[in-house]
Design a protein with these regions (language model features):
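A short acidic, Gly/Pro-enriched loop at the edge of an enzyme's catalytic core
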Residues: 75-87
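A short glycine-rich, Lys/Arg-flanked "PGG" loop and its adjoining helix->strand segment in the class I
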Residues: 100-115
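Conserved class I S-adenosyl-L-methionine
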Residues: 115-145
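Short alpha-helix
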Residues: 133, 145-168
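Conserved catalytic loop of SAM-dependent methyltransferase domains
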Residues: 164-190, 199-200
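C-terminal lobe and adjacent flexible extensions of AdoMet/dcAdoMet transferase-like proteins
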Residues: 188-247
Length: 247
């Protein structure tokens, strides 16, 4: 798998720093990471309850101890309308058959003024060029299932949903190599790329805020059952309720 390889570990380390910066000042009660349990995107966030959505059958095997794992699919999120403060999509849209539906679901569950943070591979980069060439010769560098989306396209989709773009970053300027020692030799490209050609980083991160009209309670919300997430199955409700009682 990509994220177990030296290039994958390099991506995870780089994105960890990006997510730490993006979520550190985001407050609320519920935060949701969709997939990629190898990455703790909410490490520096202080929300009351951190949830991770994983495919059916993987909620135990891939569980990250920092999260409460929930089984489901991103196209049909098992949460009530306007119930989540923060949603993280690490490399989700580019591997989805219907990324528009995922964004619609994220929009449905986010509270007004809630935030979505998205990461993805940048097609306008050396890694993107390597992937394009690999498809022509039958030797992919990144997973062939990915339909890598440009940052501009994702920005357009978010604007159509009336989201306000908050911040964005590019990262990972090393050459698309496979061996760890060869990638380590390219470390000098990080500072050069960040200064001279930042938009050609191999990965990007974008943060946006939901600007739909709506109201939100001010102050501490009582810890009553699970009205914010009533669509969970019984076992999941009991598990999350236990966590809520300990907050």
């Amino acid at each position: 798998m990509l994220f177990r390889s030296p290039p994958g570990q390099y991506i995870l380390q780089s994105e960890q720093a990006l997510f730490n910066q993006a979520v550190t000042d985001v407050f609320g009660y519920y935060a949701l990471q969709i997939g990629l349990p190898q990455l703790n995107t909410l490490q520096e966030n202080r929300v009351s309850l951190k949830l991770m959505l994983l495919p059916h059958g993987r909620a135990t095997a891939d569980q990250n101890s920092a999260y409460q794992s929930i089984e489901g699919i991103p196209e049909e999120l098992p949460f009530a309308d306007q119930s989540i403060d923060l949603v993280i999509l690490p490399h989700v849209l580019e591997f989805a058959q219907d990324p528009h539906q995922i964004l619609r679901e994220v929009d449905r569950v986010l509270i007004p003024e809630g935030r979505v943070v998205i990461s993805g591979f940048n097609p306008a980069s050396l890694w993107g060029a390597r992937q394009y060439a690999g498809r022509l010769i039958g030797k992919n560098y990144l997973p062939r299932e990915g339909q890598f989306l440009s940052l501009l396209r994702i920005k357009d989709w978010l604007k159509l949903l009336d989201y306000s773009l908050d911040r964005g970053h590019f990262a990972c300027y090393r050459l698309p190599l496979r061996k760890e020692k060869n990638m380590a030799r390219m470390a000098f490209l990080e500072k050069m790329g960040n200064r001279w050609w930042p938009i050609f980083g191999s990965v990007f991160l974008i943060s946006a805020i939901k600007r739909h009209p709506g109201t939100r309670l001010v102050g501490r919300v009582p810890k009553q059952s699970l009205q914010a997430i009533p669509q969970l199955n019984t076992a999941a409700q009991q598990s999350v309720q236990k966590v809520l009682e300990e907050v």
